[in-house]
A protein has these predicted regions:
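Short beta-strand micro-motifs in enzyme catalytic cores
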Residues: 38-40, 67, 99-103
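Short amphipathic alpha-helices within nucleic acid-binding modules
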Residues: 19, 77-82
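Vicinal oxygen chelate
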Residues: 29, 80-120
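Short, charged/polar, Gly/Pro-enriched secondary-structure boundary elements
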Residues: 47-51, 61, 110-113
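N-terminal beta-strand motif that seeds the catalytic metal site of vicinal oxygen chelate
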Residues: 1-17, 67-71, 119
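Short glycine-enriched loop/turn motifs at secondary-structure junctions
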Residues: 1-2, 61-66, 96-97
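Core segments of cupin and vicinal oxygen chelate
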Residues: 7-48
Length: 120
């Protein structure tokens, strides 16, 4: 079995899609827009696990405080600086082991996103 997607329902749909496309670097692999329904699937490529973003204007700004999504990056320090320049408020860098460093940042919908360099 392979994981298909992680779904985020949000009132800030355009900002959310932009975050995962422009900051994380995912590509739109499928988009569905019919009437009031608007869904975008983003991933690293066809057949890969997707972030499914659903436009839900009544979703408010709250999200599951325990949800966290992690991405690997080649240079966590550089990405953290870029996010700060764009107005995001990333956590301090953490390094629980010599070959691992990471930080967290909230996406526009309030989901905690971790960017990890190194690791397993």
């Amino acid at each position: 079995m392979k994981m298909a997607q992680v779904t985020i329902r949000t009132a800030v749909f355009d900002k959310e899609v932009s975050f995962y496309r422009d900051v994380v670097g995912l590509k739109t692999v499928h988009e569905l827009q019919e009437g009031l329904l608007h869904i975008v699937f983003l991933s690293n490529g066809e057949g890969e696990t997707c972030i499914e973003v659903i436009d839900q204007s009544d979703a408010g700004t709250t999200c599951n405080p325990y949800l966290s999504i992690g991405f690997r990056t080649a240079d966590a320090s550089r990405l953290r600086q870029e996010l700060m320049q764009k107005g995001y408020e990333p956590s301090p860098m953490a390094s629980p082991a010599p070959a691992v460093q990471f930080f967290f940042v909230k996406d526009p919908a309030g989901v905690t996103v971790q960017f990890v360099e190194g690791g397993f």
